[in-house]
């Protein structure tokens, strides 16, 4: 069919009247209005303007028209209507856009191929880079091995230079090997311990997480009032912890300040005495305040008697309440024993929360047993306390009776005598205040005079030392004057000393020349030995071994530092303490919650 017959190449430029293998433009009408070009001709008949037949006669257009491709539809060919007629008209039909699309597709294909080549080149470069990197790593390992061998050779050269025997070298080697083996074993032990501790920490963290989940479950199962109370207690706990941190910081700062003050006081005798006096003053003031408070708290004998009777009644009520609590506790023990038996029966069926409740009840039972065991002792203590209180009541009653008799005697005193006694008391109090101020003034004067005395003693010691030094100088100058007064003896001794020094100079010059010759000979021998040693391969190996030994020493030091840092990193004691503290807090919170739940 005509719709399946497409031209793969662009259409040639055609002219009217020229017998080319192209079809006429689709926009040209046929010469006759009665004749219509068939759109669905059989394959045997050729269409006008197609490859199968000659070009139709038409001289409608005298100019060339460029057509990209022939439009093909299901019903054959259809021309495009143009907006204007005339020469050089371009038809932008479907074939034009298809050709344009093909050109763009070819450009995109070339660009994609170009990018694909660049990607392949990049991948090749990347693979080469990876191979180079691997090769560099292997070469670095080889260099490290060679450095180790070089250090060994340097150490060997050093041993040869120092004329070390082979047995000593082997003993050093064995010692280093044993030390390295021990350090390797210790590192392995530390590593295994660290793994075990990390595993233990993970298990503890899991247990803590489980306890947290259990606590969250208990909190969720609480009533809203208890949840609100729990949240309030939690916030209060956080606030108290913050206050504890701040108070701890303040305590640390005060302790540091105290230590600095103590060190400052330790170097000063006057400050130590002042501290002792302040402590004594503080004790006296506290004793005075205590006596004043006791005097104020002491009432009349009747009030004391009533207070003691009230205290006896309160103690009796407390003993009765304790007995009632004891009976209640016994009833609770029986009840809990029944619950424990029931829990023992249901323990195999119900695990988890029931097991936890069983443990709590078991613990509560142990606490109650301990209370019952210590009840007799506490009871005896309370009875002894009661007897002591009764004895004190009796003594106070006797004291009250004596005071009453004394008050009766005092009541017989006249107002004039009482006024005289009050005046005497005020006079004595003023005298006491004056004596206290005098004592304070005398204390300050004593301290000031002690300071002056210390200064005077210091000056006296300095003057004594200076006087002694001046006496020594006078003695030395007197001896020098006696020596320098005899000039003839000084000249003769100087001449003798000069002759002796000349003789020593000549002897030392001869020795110097001899030693110079010996030194030149030794220097030449040293140079020859040095050249021989430099040419010797063993010396070169020993030098290399010495360098390798230094490298090993450096590596050993680095490994020791690494082991020390890892040991510090693997210190798990603070973590364990923190975890155990949190576990104890969570357990306490859960116990309190369960206790409140059981009460409610």
Swiss-Prot record:
MF-aspect GO terms: beta-tubulin binding; chromatin binding
Modified residues (Phosphothreonine): 73
Region described as Disordered: 1-64
Subcellular location per the Swiss-Prot or TrEMBL entry: Cell projection, Cilium; Cytoplasmic vesicle; Cell projection, Cilium, Flagellum; Cytoplasmic vesicle, Secretory vesicle, Acrosome
Positions where Omega-N-methylarginine occurs in the chain: 51
Statement: the UniProt record of this protein carries the keyword Coiled coil: yes
InterPro entries: IFT74 (IPR029602)
Phosphoprotein among keywords: yes
Biased composition (Low complexity): 22-33
Keyword terms: Cell projection, Cilium, Cilium biogenesis/degradation, Coiled coil, Cytoplasmic vesicle, Developmental protein, Flagellum, Methylation, Phosphoprotein
Coiled coil spans: 97-390
Residue span of region Basic region: 1-90
Tissues expressing the protein: Predominantly expressed in testis, but also detected in other organs containing cilia-bearing cells, including lung, brain and kidney (at protein level).
GO CC entries: acrosomal vesicle; centrosome; cilium; intraciliary transport particle B; motile cilium; nucleus
Gene Ontology biological process terms, A to Z: cilium assembly; determination of left/right symmetry; epidermis development; heart development; intraciliary anterograde transport; intraciliary transport; intraciliary transport involved in cilium assembly; keratinocyte development
Biased composition (Gly residues): 50-59
Subunit structure: Component of the IFT complex B, at least composed of IFT20, IFT22, IFT25, IFT27, IFT46, IFT52, TRAF3IP1/IFT54, IFT57, IFT74, IFT80, IFT81, and IFT88. Interacts with IFT81; the interaction is direct: within the IFT complex B, IFT74 and IFT81 mediate the transport of tubulin within the cilium. Interacts (via basic region) with beta-tubulin (via acidic region); interaction is direct. Interacts with ARL13B and IFT88. Interacts (via the IFT74/IFT81 heterodimer) with RABL2B. Interacts with IFT57 and IFT70B.
Entry similarity comment: Belongs to the IFT74 family.
Main function: Component of the intraflagellar transport (IFT) complex B: together with IFT81, forms a tubulin-binding module that specifically mediates transport of tubulin within the cilium. Binds beta-tubulin via its basic region. Required for ciliogenesis. Essential for flagellogenesis during spermatogenesis.
Protein name (database record): Intraflagellar transport protein 74 homolog
Organism annotation: Mus musculus (Mouse)
The gene coding this protein: Ift74
